[in-house]
C-alpha cells in the first residue's frame, strides 16, 4: 500500500554541475530527502554521521522541539534519502557514531553514549566526564570530544586522554581555536596565533604533533574541513579552499560572480555543516539552504573529485 505523502512544501530541486578549483575538478550530484525538513535557529543546524552505510541526522529547528529532540536514520536508495528509523535522542549539539555502533550525542550540557546494536538503542549510558562536539573514527576505536579552546579529548577503549597540541601558545600554536574536527587519522583545526583577527588552518596527528599549517589566513574561523588524498579541503562559508599536504595554499573558489563559485557546483549557495567520507574520490557534503521567504531545509550532495 502507498504510504501517505507527508504534508508540507516540496523539496527544492537543484541543477548541479561541476567546478574547477585550481588544478582540480569537483562534480556534484544532488541527493534529495524524500520528505522536506525545516531547520532554523542556531548556527550549526545539522549534525550528521554514517554507520553501516546509512546516514544519521539531527535537524535543529528552534520552532519544532519534537524534531530537534530526535535523530533520523536514512538510507540512500535510487539516489534519494529514504527514512529508515527515528530515535528519541537529542543530537542537536553533537552527534557521532564510532565503528562499533556507539552513538555519541550531546544534550545542552552532557555527552551520552547510546548503543545502536542493543535491544534499546534509546537508553543512554552514564553521562561522560566531558562535553563538546564529537567526532568518531571509522577506522579505529577512537572518538574525539572538543569544547572550544579546551584540550581535545581522545576516547579510546573507555579511557580519556586530554591531548596536548604541539606549540607554545594557549592551545598548541593558537591563542584561540574555534574549529576542530577529526578526518582520517588527523585532527584538523582553525585557530588564531595572536589577537590579530587572522585565523590559520593546522593539522595534527593523534599524538598532537603538527603536520601542516596554512601558508596564509583562511576565510573564516568557523570551517568545515576534510583531509583529501591531495591535501586539505576547507569550507569557509560559501567558499571552498584547497591546501597542499604541507599547508601551502593552492586555490579557492570565488566568493561571488558568474563563474567559479559554489553556485556552479551545487546550483546555489548552501551553508555546509558536515563533510562525510565516501570512497577515495567522493564525499557527501551535508548542509542547508534557504530563501529569504521560507525556512531553510537540509541538503545533501555527493561530491566527486580528483582532489
Tell where the protein language model's regions lie, with residue ranges:
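Short loop/turn segments that connect beta-strands within beta-propeller blades
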Residues: 75-79, 115-119, 156-159, 205-209, ...
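Repeated scaffold domains used in trafficking and secretory/extracellular systems
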Residues: 40-49, 89-100, 128-142, 170-182, ...
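Residue position within the beta-strands of beta-propeller blades
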Residues: 57, 104-105, 145-146, 188-190, ...
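A short beta-strand motif characteristic of beta-propeller blades
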Residues: 26-39, 80-87, 120-130, 159-172, ...
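N-terminal "mature head" segments of proteins
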Residues: 1-75, 81, 85-88, 111
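Conserved core beta-strand positions within WD40 beta-propeller blades
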Residues: 54, 101-103, 141-142, 185-187, ...
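Blade-level signature of beta-propeller repeat domains, shared across WD40, Kelch, NHL, RCC1
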Residues: 273-307
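Structural motif
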Residues: 64-72, 109-114, 149-155, 195-202, ...
Amino acid at each position: 500500500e502507498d504510504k501517505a505523502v507527508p504534508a508540507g512544501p516540496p523539496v527544492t530541486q537543484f541543477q548541479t554541475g561541476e567546478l574547477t578549483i585550481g588544478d582540480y575538478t569537483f562534480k556534484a550530484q544532488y541527493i534529495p530527502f524524500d520528505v522536506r525538513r525545516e531547520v532554523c535557529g542556531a548556527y550549526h543546524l545539522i549534525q550528521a554521521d554514517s554507520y553501516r552505510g546509512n546516514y544519521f541526522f539531527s535537524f535543529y529547528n528552534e520552532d519544532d522541539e519534537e524534531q530537534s529532540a530526535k535523530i533520523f536514520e536514512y538510507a540512500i536508495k535510487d539516489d534519494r534519502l529514504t527514512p529508515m528509523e527515528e530515535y528519541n535522542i537529542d543530537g542537536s549539539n553533537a552527534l557521532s557514531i564510532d565503528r562499533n555502533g556507539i552513538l555519541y550525542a550531546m544534550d545542552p550540557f552532557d555527552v551520552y553514549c547510546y548503543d545502536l546494536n542493543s535491544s534499546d538503542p534509546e537508553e543512554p549510558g552514564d553521562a561522560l566526564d566531558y562535553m563538546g562536539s564529537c567526532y568518531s573514527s571509522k577506522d579505529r576505536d577512537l572518538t574525539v570530544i572538543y569544547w572550544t579552546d579546551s584540550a581535545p579529548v581522545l576516547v579510546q577503549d573507555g579511557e580519556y586522554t586530554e591531548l596536548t597540541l604541539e606549540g607554545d601558545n594557549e592551545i598548541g600554536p593558537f591563542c584561540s581555536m574555534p574549529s576542530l574536527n577529526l578526518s582520517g587519522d588527523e585532527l584538523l583545526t582553525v585557530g588564531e596565533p595572536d589577537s590579530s583577527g587572522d585565523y590559520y588552518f593546522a593539522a595534527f596527528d593523534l599524538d598532537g604533533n603538527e603536520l601542516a599549517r596554512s601558508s596564509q589566513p583562511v576565510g573564516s574561523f568557523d570551517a568545515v574541513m576534510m583531509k583529501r588524498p591531495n591535501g586539505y579541503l576547507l569550507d569557509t562559508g560559501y567558499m571552498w579552499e584547497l591546501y597542499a599536504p604541507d599547508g601551502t595554499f593552492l586555490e579557492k573558489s570565488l566568493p561571488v560572480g558568474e563563474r567559479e563559485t559554489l553556485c556552479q557546483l551545487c546550483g546555489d549557495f548552501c551553508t555546509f555543516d558536515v563533510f562525510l567520507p565516501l570512497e577515495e574520490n567522493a564525499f557527501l557534503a551535508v548542509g542547508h539552504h534557504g530563501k529569504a521567504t521560507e525556512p531553510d531545509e537540509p541538503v545533501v550532495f555527493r561530491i566527486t573529485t580528483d582532489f
